[in-house]
């Protein structure tokens, strides 16, 4: 038996991680059962830790803090099989980055000279008049003096020459803004949008690049381009700029054999006269190809010290992935539009032959309107946005001859791009690139219904489109790391893609942005300046509970206690805040012994996005049962977390609180365990969160089933309860109803969007209405959570705490179904197929795992590793 798919801290051969303890994981091959393992860790070719032979079937291990900064390390492992025979050694490599104290350079600000910005480029021509109009309206309404427009700025370029000898060379680099770097004209690394998305006034992350092959003996030149990035671009629905400061900066050091040979300092030169004339994450990028080649306008820089914490590269990089060729079409109103066939987050590469000064402008959007014309109106909030909306523009000012432009410092959500140009497009090539964090697709589901298959593909694409360093709600309007979205999607997200590193990074941002009183920022990292209602809405149950739900799910899937330890204080503080809301309940609001465990005060989003209920109605009249339900549910989970961390007293306290919250829920929101409501969500949540007794849950499920049938098999659940709906129905014997909900072709239902040609999951059930008019975002991953039931219910795969159960729920409406899940333990397959009334099952179990299988006819058995037909 041998170990395969070795990972260090959930990463494959990571470079630049922080020093500290390591979480090592692997899978098994060429055997049946692992009975023991042995691990040896080396740092800079010296053995620093040996486990010895450990009698265990676990496929992960924790090490002590074996690696310092700047370490090139490795670990090797061998396994013993069921016959106590050792296998061959397998090896993996890792490398640590710099510690905070290792940085010797200074922060360099390149913008020390006045920048001439004509303002006639596409982005400023769009933003300036809108800004000035809105400011004039603000002043006229007596809401303050009009503020002057700040033009969008060109990228900066910085250079430094240095002499070096050949050797093992590493570049350590980070930026306030985004950077791209070249050594002697060769691009460094394949990460885009580096260093990534952070709460930039509280911390940043740095990358480590192996530049040994790029370094020359003798004279070398390092060139860096610096863009606005998340640091000071427009952001969110309000279009706020300079969120983390109005000054960009870069910090780096290039080392050869562990010694700095080139660091950021005041000997550098900078210019703003390069081809990137404007750049903004949300609004777009303007590129003047006439300025390519030798850069001019070099001037001095300003340096400064900053004690801003800098962490290593503890996640996966953002990369370019799939490429989509553009197909030119003419719309009814005569516009030239590119259709790339897939709604993505990314950008467009342009290649064409043109004359000097000719321009090509692309405006990117998700849909065509009801008349077949290009539109962006579905995702705009032009009234709120300070610059009149999200531009999503790319402009190329051409040089003579062949032109090539691929954006460096922007990303946008789109399927279509409107083309405006005075150049000949006969031989032009437009290619869209999907840009997202480097996550492998780990879940595949196919069945006999093409629309369901498309729904799964759409869900994967919405995850790709919104997991760009941190999870966001949409890649167009808000681009916000909403807690609520992640809370309802994490289980499904971990199945569809290997998103653990992205979720782990996002949780660090959540911790940094938690309020002193324990409430959770709804969005992390911040993407707008807080409004007056922001602190009130940051107390929302279900949203704040992501602080518990997300790390809990990650631990149950991987067994890594570090995710619990890192986030335990955040979990505790949020739960204490939620309990504090309950403690404010007055006798007038609720009587009885458990009134102080009933969450009735404060603002909540409530169920959110229920069909027939507007967002404003939901906010003004949230479902009061939600807070108490989460006080019970999250309390149980937090008790489990405390137990895992060895905090028995905490665990007992949280269990007591959760039990009291259940009693409070029953007293306030049921009549002796009977729910009286016309909304499906109240039944779903009560059953899913075990707020009722078993017989009461059966009765509630029966009522829920009847309500769904009376609603012509349409759901009317909202944001928080929809992920549980089909699972709850199937669990209590109403799988046929769950399937009818799944296959409902009309809105509200999952397949309505598929029928409208969607290639991603929508924000609302009617993102494109019956008249063909698009509304709201057309790339929101949260409703893709239904895929969790396809894997865990339809095909029955559930992997948690290192154990695998399979309990499929076949139905003739699909004819056949097959789910493949590349779990932390290896590939799991569960499938079934009807032949008349006979169902045949096929299963595949990875090495070192068994599966406890339960079939609908009551048969129960355990499967060993291998392929099985039943």
Q: Over which residues does each language-model region extend?
A:
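Non-catalytic C-terminal accessory modules of carbohydrate-active enzymes
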Residues: 246, 251, 268-291, 312-322, ...
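Alpha-helix capping and helix-loop boundary segments enriched in small/acidic/polar residues
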Residues: 146-153, 170, 196-200, 210-212, ...
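C-terminal capping/lid segments that line or modulate ligand- or cofactor-binding pockets
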Residues: 280, 284-288, 478, 496, ...
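Alpha-helical support elements that line or immediately flank enzyme active sites
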Residues: 170, 347-366, 420, 484-514, ...
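Active-site acid/base region of carbohydrate-active enzymes
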Residues: 177-178, 260-267, 271-272, 416, ...
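Active/binding-pocket-proximal capping segment
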Residues: 179, 187-190, 194-195, 510, ...
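Extracellular/oxidizing-compartment recognition motifs
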Residues: 1-476, 484-485, 499-504, 521-528, ...
């Amino acid at each position: 038996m041998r170990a395969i798919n070795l990972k260090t801290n959930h990463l494959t051969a990571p470079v630049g991680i922080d020093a500290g303890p390591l979480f090592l994981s692997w899978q098994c091959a060429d055997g049946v059962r692992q009975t023991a393992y042995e691990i040896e860790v080396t740092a800079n070719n010296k053995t620093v830790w040996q486990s010895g032979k450990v009698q265990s079937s676990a496929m992960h291990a924790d090490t002590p803090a074996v690696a310092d900064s700047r370490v090139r390390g490795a670990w090797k492992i061998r396994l013993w099989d069921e016959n106590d025979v050792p296998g061959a050694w397998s090896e993996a490599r890792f490398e640590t980055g710099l510690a905070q104290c290792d940085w010797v350079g200074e922060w360099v600000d390149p913008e020390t000279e006045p920048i001439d910005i004509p303002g006639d480029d596409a982005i400023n021509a769009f933003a300036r008049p809108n800004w000035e109009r809105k400011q004039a309206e603000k002043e006229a309404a007596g809401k303050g003096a009009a503020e002057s427009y700040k033009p969008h700025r060109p990228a900066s370029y910085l250079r430094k020459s240095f002499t070096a000898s050949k050797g093992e060379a590493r570049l350590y680099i980070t930026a306030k803004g985004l950077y791209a770097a070249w050594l002697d004209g060769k691009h460094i690394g394949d990460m885009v949008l580096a260093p990534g998305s952070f709460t930039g006034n509280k911390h940043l992350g740095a990358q480590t690049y192996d530049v040994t092959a790029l370094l020359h003996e003798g004279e070398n030149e390092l060139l860096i381009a610096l863009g606005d990035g998340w640091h000071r671009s427009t952001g969110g629905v309000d279009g706020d700029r300079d969120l983390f400061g109005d000054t960009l900066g870069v910090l780096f050091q290039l080392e050869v054999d562990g010694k700095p040979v080139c660091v950021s300092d005041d000997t550098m030169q900078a210019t703003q006269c390069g081809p990137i004339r404007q750049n903004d994450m949300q609004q777009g990028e303007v590129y003047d190809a006439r300025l390519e080649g030798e850069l001019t306008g070099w001037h001095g820089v300003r340096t400064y010290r900053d004690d801003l914490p800098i962490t290593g590269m503890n996640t996966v990089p953002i990369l370019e992935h799939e490429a989509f060729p553009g197909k030119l079409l003419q719309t009814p109103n005569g516009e030239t539009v590119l259709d790339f066939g897939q709604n993505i987050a990314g950008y467009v590469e342009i290649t064409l032959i043109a004359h000097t000064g000719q321009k090509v402008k692309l405006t990117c959007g998700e849909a065509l309107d009801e008349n077949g014309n290009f539109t962006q109106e579905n995702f705009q909030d032009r009234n709120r946005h300070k610059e009149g909306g999200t531009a999503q523009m790319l402009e190329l000012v051409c040089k003579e001859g062949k032109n090539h432009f691929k954006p460096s410092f922007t990303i946008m959500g789109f399927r279509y791009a409107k083309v405006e140009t005075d150049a000949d497009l006969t031989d032009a090539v437009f290619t869209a690139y999907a840009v997202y964090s480097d996550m492998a697709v780990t879940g595949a589901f196919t069945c006999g219904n093409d629309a369901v298959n498309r729904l799964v593909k759409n869900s994967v694409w919405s995850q790709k489109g919104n997991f760009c360093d941190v999870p966001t709600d949409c890649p167009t309007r808000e681009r916000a790391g909403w807690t609520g979205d992640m809370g309802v999607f994490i289980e499904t997200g971990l199945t569809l893609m290997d998103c653990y590193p992205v979720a782990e990074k996002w949780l660090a941002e959540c911790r940094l942005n938690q309020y002193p009183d324990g409430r959770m920022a709804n969005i992390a990292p911040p993407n707008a300046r807080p409004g007056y209602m922001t602190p009130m809405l940051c107390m929302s149950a279900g949203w704040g509970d992501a602080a518990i739900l997300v790390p809990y799910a990650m631990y149950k899937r991987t067994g890594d206690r570090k995710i619990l330890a890192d986030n335990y204080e955040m979990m505790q503080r949020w739960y204490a805040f939620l309990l504090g809301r309950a403690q404010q309940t007055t006798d007038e609001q609720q009587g009885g012994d458990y009134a102080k465990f009933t969450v009735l005060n404060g603002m909540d989003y409530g169920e959110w996005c229920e069909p027939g209920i507007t967002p404003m109605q939901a906010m003004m009249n949230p479902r009061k049962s939600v807070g108490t339900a989460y006080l019970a549910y999250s309390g149980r989970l937090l008790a489990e977390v405390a137990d895992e961390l060895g905090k028995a007293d905490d665990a007992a306290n949280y269990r007591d609180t959760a039990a009291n919250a259940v009693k409070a829920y029953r007293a306030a929101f049921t009549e002796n365990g009977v729910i009286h409501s016309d909304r499906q969500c109240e039944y779903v949540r009560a059953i899913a969160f075990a707020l009722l007794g078993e017989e009461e849950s059966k009765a509630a499920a029966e009522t829920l089933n009847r309500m769904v049938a009376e609603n012509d098999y349409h759901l009317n659940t909202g944001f928080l309860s929809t992920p549980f709906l089909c699972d709850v129905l199937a669990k209590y014997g109403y799988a046929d109803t769950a399937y009818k909900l799944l296959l409902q072709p009309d809105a509200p239902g999952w397949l309505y969007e598929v029928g409208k040609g969607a290639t991603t999951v929508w924000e609302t059930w009617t993102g494109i209405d019956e008249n063909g008019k698009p509304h709201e975002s057309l790339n929101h991953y949260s409703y893709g959570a239904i895929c969790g039931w396809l894997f865990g219910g339809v095909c029955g795969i559930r992997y948690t705490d290192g154990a695998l159960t399979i309990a499929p729920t076949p139905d003739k409406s699909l004819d056949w179904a097959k789910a493949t899940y590349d779990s932390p333990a290896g590939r799991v397959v569960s499938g079934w197929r009807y032949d008349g009334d006979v169902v045949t099952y096929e299963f595949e179990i990875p090495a070192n795992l068994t599966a406890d299988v339960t079939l609908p006819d009551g048969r129960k058995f355990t499967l060993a590793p291998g392929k099985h037909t039943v």
